[in-house]
UniProtKB/Swiss-Prot annotation:
PROSITE patterns: PX
PANTHER family for the chain: SORTING NEXIN-4
Membrane topology: Peripheral membrane protein
Keyword Protein biosynthesis belongs to the record: no
GO molecular function, one term: phosphatidylinositol binding
Physiological role: Sorting nexin involved in the separation or division of vacuoles throughout the entire life cycle of the cells. Required for glucose-induced micropexophagy and ethanol-induced macropexophagy. Involved in the fusion between the pexophagosome and the vacuole. Also involved in the separation or division of vacuoles throughout the entire life cycle of the cells.
Cellular compartment(s): Cytoplasm; Membrane; Vacuole membrane
Record domain PX: where: 77-198
Name used for this protein in its record: Sorting nexin-4
Species of the source: Komagataella pastoris (Yeast)
Length: 661
């Protein structure tokens, strides 16, 4: 920045030999208001009425396509381009890829209605830079990213990479053709036409690295370096600042930013999901191909050495089945490639297109910061002028210089009353400050008007972007659905051609075989088991090795089952033992409780029981002693016994009484 302020200019200097102009003056910023932004029949469509606003186009100098009275063409004017057929060519030293661009149009500015031309990627990049310089306030569709891994690993000439790039370039040209201002650019028409003007225009016109300014043919490397340094310094200064001025459209821009972030987030999610879908579909396609190969081998094995009509028909059915399997594999591969090349590439391009909007909003904020910075410089200049006029000090250095100048003036014989004489340094500085203030006021006014106009134009550009984005998303989804419809229709059509014999048809054939006695001949024919011996399809003992592997696998499976059964039995036995031990412990606890109770009761009842037993034992002993004495005295005392029987039974009564007692 020079002289403590910056100048906001979007200029474009024409190259030497094109259009004469004043090389000493900077080309001024021209804001061309196009009142009729949308086409003549736009009033019939309600959704397009919002776009009928003042659209400002910042163009450069005296360029031929910067006519202020230039009108937007009607809606029936169209330009349809298609990029295809990438071709590897050489310019004698290096190889490059050129793309065929086929255009159909009714644009009056073009010489033909159908155009064909081949352009390189660098030509498209040059077109993008020219449009960015001619229309700095418009949202220019982005080009595909050139910083790709293919440039490092050397696969930039491969079919996959070039096809994807041609689709991305096709999206780039279609977006330009849908923009009402960009499709009117002269450089765009020259790009589409097959003429020598393109190479001449490209050689004479030189575009600087700054996308907001064009440097003419007389520019030097030092000028470009200074411009890049200024841009880098401005970027560093504005990176950590935010504008304090809040415009009337601040809420609308905040809503635009939120919508853009949300849309970009959803697009990234869809892209990740379809990346996985494409990967799974490619694996399915490969599996179908391998399945078709194995089915074809099986058909050859079953039909080898068989010449009957039934075998021939069966072989035809097997062949038709395997061919349909191959067709499914091819259709799956085709579907995967279409989704990958067209749909995913369109999602990536739309993501980059949204990033362009966010960059334009950041560019608007940077211009607002420049306006605030110029306003601060103007306020400082006015404050410095007021201090000088009032005789006050602004800063230490300025006060010291003022004091020294006054002392020198006093030594020369100048009195303090002669402060504003013609030779006074303070007077000269005030005059310089007045010039600086006038220049800053003019710059501040122009910068604010430019910012205000840029803000309105950016709102209109977002509406145009929203319309282009909706059309593009609708077209992409329609194409995606068409890809899947074509895939399933192809599968159904191919499988309908396969004739599967019904049970009645098979019964009739068997009946014919029985009637012609072919069945007996077939029973006598010994057919070798094709899957047990080696043949052309199975060499190097593949069948035997396969059977060995199967037997070993069966053995391992059976051994594993036995081990599992043993482990299960051991677990059951351990569980039963644990339950038995628990039952024993519970029974022992229950037995110990009544034993303790019986011991206590026995101690309590021991005394009365012993007494009762003694009482019962005494009469028994007495009775036993009497019976013994009676038996001993019976032969000696017979008379006495008779006497007792006849006379009295006193002795017996006494015994009974004792017993009763």
């Amino acid at each position: 920045m020079s002289d403590q302020f910056t100048s906001i200019q979007w200029d474009r200097t024409e190259p030497e030999g094109d259009v004469p102009g004043d090389s000493n003056d900077h080309s001024q910023v021209q804001i061309n208001s196009s009142i009729n932004l949308i086409e003549e029949d736009q009033g019939q469509e309600q959704e397009q009425d919002d776009l009928v606003t003042t659209n400002t186009v910042v163009r450069g100098g005296n360029d031929s396509d910067s006519n202020p009275n230039e009108q937007i063409p009607p809606r029936d004017v169209y330009i349809r381009s298609k990029v295809s057929q990438p071709l590897k060519e050489s310019d004698g030293q290096n190889f490059y890829i050129s793309y065929l661009i086929e255009t159909e149009t009714n644009e009056p500015g073009l010489a033909k209605t159908k155009l064909k031309v081949r352009r390189r990627f660098s030509d498209s990049n040059f077109l993008y830079n020219c449009l960015a310089n001619d229309f700095p306030t418009s949202i220019i569709p982005p080009l595909p990213n050139k910083q790709r891994l293919e440039y490092i690993k050397g696969d930039r000439f491969g079919e996959y990479f070039t096809t994807k790039r041609s689709i991305a370039l096709n999206n780039f040209l279609n977006r330009i053709s849908k923009h009402p201002l960009l499709k009117q650019a002269k450089i765009y028409h020259i790009f589409l036409e097959d003429s020598v003007n393109w190479n001449t225009f490209k050689q004479n016109l030189k575009i600087s690295s700054n996308p907001n300014s064009t440097v003419g043919g007389g520019s030097t490397t030092s000028a470009n370096a200074n411009g890049e340094l200024d841009s880098f310094s401005d970027y560093i200064m504005n990176a950590f600042k935010k504008p304090t001025y809040e415009s009337e459209n601040a809420k609308e821009f905040q809503e635009i930013t939120d919508k853009s972030n949300k849309l970009q987030e959803n697009i990234n999610k869809i892209d990740k999901i379809y990346q996985r879908v494409v990967k799974r579909q490619s694996e399915i396609s490969e599996d179908f191909r391998l399945f078709g190969d194995e089915f074809k081998k099986l058909n050859q094995i079953l039909t080898e050495g068989s010449d009957t009509q039934f075998d021939k028909e069966l072989s035809q059915q097997f062949t038709s089945f395997s061919e349909n399997i191959y067709q499914i594999s091819y259709d799956s591969f085709k579907l995967t490639r279409q989704v990958d090349l067209h749909y995913l590439t369109s999602l990536k391009d739309l993501d980059h297109y949204i990033s362009q909007i966010k960059n334009m909003i950041k560019f608007k904020d940077s211009k607002l910061l420049d306006y605030e910075m110029l306003q601060n410089y103007l306020n400082k200049a006015i404050a410095e002028k007021n201090h000088l006029m009032n005789g006050n000090n602004v800063s230490g250095s300025d006060g010291a210089m003022n004091f020294i100048s006054k002392k020198i003036g006093s030594l020369r014989g100048k009195t303090p009353g002669q402060t504003y004489s013609s030779g006074n340094e303070t007077n000269d500085r005030i005059n310089k400050l007045n010039e600086k203030i006038e220049f800053l006021e003019r710059e501040v006014k122009e910068t604010f008007e430019l910012f205000h106009t840029f803000e309105k134009n950016l709102i209109t550009e977002y509406q145009l972007f929203d319309r282009i984005k909706n059309d593009e998303i609708t077209t992409n989804l329609h194409e995606l659905s068409q890809y899947y419809l074509d895939y399933y229709n192809s599968v159904v059509n191919h499988w309908n051609d396969v004739e599967i014999p019904h049970s009645e048809h098979l019964t009739d054939e068997l009946h014919v075989l029985q009637q012609s006695q072919l069945r007996k001949n077939l029973e006598n024919i010994s057919i070798d088991p094709k899957l047990d011996v080696n043949s052309k399809l199975f060499e190097h003992d593949d069948v035997r090795l396969n059977n060995d592997h199967i037997r070993s696998d069966l053995r391992s499976i059976k051994s594993q089952e036995r081990k599992n059964e043993q482990v299960h039995k051991q677990d059951q036995e351990q569980g039963e033992e644990q339950e038995h031990e628990q039952d024993q412990v519970q029974n022992q606890e229950q037995e110990q409780e009544p034993e303790e109770l019986s011991r206590e009761e026995a101690e309590v009842l021991e005394t009365p029981v012993q007494a009762q037993e003694q009482e019962q034992q005494e009469p028994e002993e007495l009775h036993a002693s009497q019976t013994e004495s009676h038996t001993q005295s019976e032969p000696q005392n017979d008379n006495q016994h008779n006497f007792d029987d006849d006379g009295s039974d006193e002795g017996l009564v006494d015994v009974e009484g004792l017993e009763q007692w």
